A protein has these predicted regions:
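Alpha-helix boundary/capping and short turn/kink residues
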Residues: 19-22, 38
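N-terminal intrinsically disordered, cationic/polar leader segments
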Residues: 2-11, 27-30, 37-68
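Long, contiguous binding/interaction regions
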Residues: 12, 17-20
């Protein structure tokens, strides 16, 4: 196994996940603010499930997104 290649591939995947998930969250928040369902000052609970079935990896990452 080439650790440098693994590192590059993991970073590429995480970059894709980060960009796509940020877009999805921002769009959903804007939609809910426009509908009046959010005021724009909430703290939203967020979670992400990272799963790689071939190696038995399943990790839940939790946090809060503060909207100001």
């Amino acid at each position: 196994m080439d650790e440098e290649i693994l590192n590059i591939q993991v970073r590429k995947f995480l970059k894709k996940v980060g960009i796509q998930s940020q877009r999805e969250i921002e769009q959903a928040v804007k939609n809910y603010i426009n509908k009046g369902s959010l005021s724009g000052a909430e703290k939203l609970d967020a979670s992400m499930l990272l799963e790689v079935p071939e190696i038995g990896l399943k990790v839940s990452i939790e946090g809060k997104i503060e909207i100001e």
